[in-house]
Amino acid sequence: MNEVTLNKIRALIASADGLMITAGAGMGVDSGLPDFRGNEGMWEYYPALGKLRIGFSSIANPQAFAENPERAWGFYGHRLMMYRQTVPHLGFRLLKELGEKLKHGYFVFTSNVDGQFQKAGFDPEKIYECHGSIHALQCMTPDDCSPSVWPNNMQPKIDNDFCELVSPLPKCKHCGELARPSILMFNDWHWQEWPYQQQNQRLNDWLKQVKSPLVIEIGAGVAIPTVRYFSEEVANGGERLIRINPANATIRLGCGVSLTMGGLAGIEMIVKEALAVL
């Protein structure tokens, strides 16, 4: 890494009064989680779906639950257990400790539904999950039932050869019909967003206090660029963004610094430079 880039990173850290952590699927790669780079990448983990040529957008939508709930819950049940068993990598703790050194602390904006930030000890009141959480459930037909969202305590058993749930399907605690993950899916008009709108309000309140945020973005893809757009919005042309991405680290001129590397390696580099100025 050249000295000019390192000097920029030190200057960003030294002037920051709050840490805005933004994270996409690439944040979990160093913990061993897949980032599903296209259908081919997903089919490596779910060969049963590959045999049927069922892509991510075809399984990750409410229609999949309506047409074949066992298969849809086979996919999401497997992911649920995988996330429960995953240990967050060191980078999570390093980011948390860095944020705690700044005047206004940290806030997390993530498109990940895996709950890894909570698992790593981050304050749940300082996390905005913009696409929801797999660790919560809602009714498939909330307009006819209830907008309630509740903890996902199911213990799924999956037949991986067919990507099918073989344990009982989760039921809505109000009407007894099928329950689904509290996640924003494709072509999804019934996702109950209100718990996450509350998270968003807390984030907006925090941003009003912070005058010079340091934005560290990790593993945010370009296919669904929600996280990337948000990072650039917060940076707001102030060169406050550090974008970490092994494949798509490109950053707009005047927006900040790009690090073409994996999440953990990039975080460790930033924290090393932080020790020199904090």
Regions found by a protein language model. Give the residues of each.
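Conserved catalytic alpha/beta core of Sir2/sirtuin-type deacylases, generalized to analogous enzyme cores
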Residues: 1-278
